[in-house]
């Protein structure tokens, strides 16, 4: 059974409808000697981000090669200016409209990827999103004493910075 829908004619109704443009998203990391962690972190981003920006603080391991394997835009700054300044420097290399910060030892779960994709389908341009972080200490996740969910601000439009 088909449906026959008609819309009232409006001025400009002959203009073709344009698809809504999805904003671009960059994953951004600052790293040093993270070869043991980086591959799994970057693999967890597959299909979600438009660019990966990595600012390296002077790795002596395979970190640069792993970043290249994932097509990351890789920059180096070995003069450590402090955590905040290093993050701002990394973000200055971002070309995307939105920023997702990660540490190399973090992974996106399938549920978190889906939640981020949902937000990115129709994001609020004036909102900074927090992500629940589950900490792993001494071989166990910490889910007590107020440690979970440890919410961290990680997803936001670059224009807000």
Where is each model-derived feature located?
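Conserved donor nucleotide-binding strand/loop of the catalytic core
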Residues: 50, 64-93
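Acidic helix N-cap motif at the loop->helix transition within catalytic regions
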Residues: 39, 61-70, 111-112
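Short beta-strand/loop segment that forms part of the nucleotide-sugar
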Residues: 29, 50-58, 75, 104
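A conserved acidic beta->alpha catalytic loop
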Residues: 44, 56-66, 79, 103
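Catalytic-site signature of metal-activated, phosphate-bearing donor transferases
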Residues: 8-10, 84-92, 97-102, 109-161
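N-proximal low-complexity "stem/linker" segments adjacent to membrane-targeting elements
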Residues: 2-44
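A generic local structural motif
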Residues: 14, 38-42, 60, 85-88, ...
